[in-house]
Amino acid sequence: GRGGKPVYIDLFHQQIGRALITGTSGSGKSVLGWRFALEALANNIPVVGMDISSSGNSTFKTAIELLGDQGAYYDISSGSSNLLEPPDLRRFDKLERERRMESWKDFIRRALSAIAMGKIHNPHLAQRVDALLIRALDVFLRDPEIITRYNRAFEMGWRSPEWQQIPTLPNFIKFCTRESLNLRSFEDLDRHALNQIQSQVGALLASRLGKAIARPSTFSPEPAIKFFALSGLTNEQDAYLMAINAHAACIRNALSHPRSLFI
């Protein structure tokens, strides 16, 4: 605190849950944040985080490297993080699984809406895109083949052949049709919205970002602390999409555990 007065914050044993650290560049924000991370690890609470480093130098990267196999620092632009990989909810009871799955679906729907709409400002179209994505996600996640592929991927684990068959964005986009969604009343706005989803997602899949967002994840789920880095992205739209994917990876990891620290 100012004037040399210490401030005691306990995120793990009191009902605080959140902390905001602000400061100018080089003021020690990351060092202070790292203290919370170490306390979480001491309490067997996994840590996930996003690190936006414009220079490529990172306090978090240096600290995580000192942890050896217990920590992992991933540059999300040099690997793949499957946007449609759900959290691993097998440790939870049915009610908690459903609650956490709904949280994940809500985030993915918002991420897909952002991809589909880009910089277009059209409230009516955005609303219809959102509604169709909700429906498409429900149909997709209830499809027997999709369910089987997800279950097999999690049963056999990361790096298994079954993991390479986990559903991804190209599988989802095939469900974004009038027939798959069983749209009996089909207005021009529906046609426009589906075309917007298909064209924007299709363009993404054809770009260099496609491999980073639409393939099975190449990041191990094992380390107790994982940071997803965003660096070297100069294009504003690319940076935005990669930030969405890094955020999705953090949300996925956080939802997979009863308690977690998200930095």
Question: Predicted regions span which residues?
Answer:
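P-loop NTPase motor domains
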Residues: 1-7, 37, 42, 52-69, ...
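Basic- and hydrophobic-enriched, low-structure N-terminal and domain-boundary segments
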Residues: 1-22
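Conserved lysine of the Walker
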Residues: 29
